[in-house]
Amino acid sequence: MPGMMWTPELALLRGFSTEAERLVWKQEGICGSDIGVFLELLLEGSYEALFFHSTTQTILNSTMMAEEKIDSYLEKQIVNFLDCSTDLEEIERQQLVFLLGVSSLQLFVQSNWTGPLVDLHPQDFLPSGLLEQFSEVKGLDAIIMGLLILDGESVYSLTSKPILLLIARIILVNIRHKLTALQSLPWWTLRYVNIHQQLLEERSPQLFALAKNCIDQVMKQENLFEGDSGRLLAIQFHLECAHVFLYYYEYKEAKDQFSTAKDISKLEIDLTGALGKRTRFQENYVAQLIVDVRRKEAVPFSCEFSPAPTPQECLAKNLELNDDTVLNEIKLADSERFQMPDLCAEELAVVLGVCTNFQKNNPVHKLTEEELLAFTSCLLSQPKFWAIQMSALILRTKLERGSTRRVERAMRQTQALADQFEDKATSVLERLKIFYCCQVPPHWAVQRQLAGLLFELGCTSSALQIFEKLEMWEDVVICHERAGRHGKAEEILRQELEKKETPGLYCLLGDVLQDHSCYDKAWELSRHRSARAQRSKALLHLRNKEFRECVECFERSVKINPMQLGVWFSLGCAYLALEDYGGSAKAFQRCVTLEPDNAEAWNNLSTSYIRLKQKVKAFRTLQEALKCNYEHWQIWENYILTSTDVGEFGEAIKAYHRLLDLRDKYKDIQVLKILVQAVVNDMTDRSGAVASSLKGKLQELFGRITSRVTNDGEVWRLYAQVHGNGQSEKPDENDKAFQCLSKAYKCDTQSSCWEKDATAFKEVVQRAIGLAHVAMKCAESKSIPQEAVQTLSSVRLNLRGLLSKAKQNFTDVVSGEVSGELASEIAAVNALEAELQDLSNQLRNRY
């Protein structure tokens, strides 16, 4: 690309020109030319007028025309103009085509996102000979929407003026290699990607690859981002990149882009607390959550290069709550202290971006909702730009729909937002200010949100009317199914199929009837290009536990479109059911690549690795799972087992603590045995460190466990082992071991029926003997004889109790002797009891 940038490119990117720029254009002779007219129309928002211009007619019309597909015709016409026109210089031809591409994209956005309605038809700029191939405009639209299918994903059926997106695609994508004079071209291609993707049912790998390529190219154009103008454009660019990355599950890259935009803006944006009132009758100020925005530098951006605010009467109205108790907004005790600086368009877009990133990276939770509402209040406190106002209000309505006091406002507000599209009071130029930084949804998505809200409120008839008008048949089916009108859903789908057969309708019919033949029909109708058909067929197989067939269909679906997160997850589950752990590992690996914070996918991936005996990989994947979900006790349980398997004993101890946080009386004897064995036997862990260094941490863990699980003798015995089991050289360790073993013995003797079962009785006797030996060792180290005697007396009582129970339960009636199988144990107890008596007497003599 040439080093010098065409001067109008920066103005086009920001959506308006400065006086200085217009003066330069005049000096360069742009103003009086066709390029000057195109440029003026674009910057005025008169995109339709550009299509009636004679130059556009020349580019798109041809008197010599063979029968051919509309996309190849348009591409050939535009390429012919670029290569063969003799009236203009090559660079001028490139500039005109580029301006036509930008205008097509902007007009398409107006037709489907911002409004007001566009009065432009294909016959206004295409030759009649070409249009004669189609019986009506709808026929042409259907052909074009077929051409806009990517990776087997269909375009929304009521997309308006798809011819405009096709022209934009041809210029900004197909022939972009011919527009070498335009340095901002890849940025406009990125904007096209963002728009086209929002029309598709699923994410398109083709579009994502194109987006990444465009981002790399723009990053190399350093002269785009020079000076004050460049700084503001840099903020816009990084925000646009962030939204693209976010949509394609690239959360880390998105976060980095949002951070870069925030750094360039030099804003400090923090969630904080402030004293305030939320209700009309609240007497005292209490802590409220707010967003505090500060500038790091006192000097704001130059207003010359930032869009001028839109008059408030032209913005979507922020409706009052009209509640008799809750205030419309929080009333702060010290509002001046938290007064937000007067923000420009780019700065407000940064606040919105931080809000969006926060929403995507936090769980659905009441606290998260409150934090997001704080962001919307912040944004709505400075109503200046249509796109930002729309985005903030749409988010607020989603958050308020679950509140009984706010749901009525949410419905009224959503209706007002849906009506914005047809409102002609606000020009498209005002609506497009900062538009690509805000991810405003298309107008049908807003109407769909309204219908969903109406359905939740029980207004099923009104919701159905909207869904049917939008031809959102899946939602229509859901409405009827939930209302129990199963036959009605089938009837509507068959009526639509009589009008026109589409793969999507057959898939929906298959969902209703649970009939594989419908999916097969959709597959054939799509010429084996419908990822949805194979996806739906696979899900039916999965529901019927036909895992082999399910896997085959899912594999076909992801081959067409590998960016289907839910399909990879379900495919992994199907492979697990088939015990094909290699297949499940591959599927869940793709799943976590697409969505790195999917804890369940990480957990299932680790399960696959465990079954494949790749335990180190399992350990690492579980670490990732826990980063995503710190509260999931099943993941922690898998983690603790895997940690002990691979020798990560320190991690196992941490995991056990976390499980005690999550499940108060959690207990896993097997894990505790492994940890005790590792510490007592001084084993080495995975990194080569000796486990004995963990002795203190393990003792701390047992202290916590035994404070909650007090009645398990095995736990107390393991705790005693950590303290040396009474064989330590340290008297205090032996004392602790004795205490643990005493409690273990108490637990054993409090269990039921042990005294009547010879095997169980023998085991208790052996433990009592062991406890007595530890008591004797402890007594030896006591400096105070009375304490030593007390220790020995407690175990003597245990032994006497056992002798009594043996005599009571295991004495032969004829001989009067204790049962032979216990004879040796009873003899040992008698001898030990006598020894303890002698030792106690000796100690008493020291009093």
From Swiss-Prot:
SUPFAM superfamilies: TPR-like. TPR repeats lie at residues 457-490, 496-529, 531-564, 565-598, 600-632, 633-666. Gene3D superfamilies: Tetratricopeptide repeat domain (1.25.40.10). The keyword Lyase does not apply. Coiled coil: none annotated. Keywords: Repeat, TPR repeat. Belongs to the TTC27 family. PANTHER family: TETRATRICOPEPTIDE REPEAT PROTEIN 27. This is Tetratricopeptide repeat protein 27. It comes from Mus musculus (Mouse).
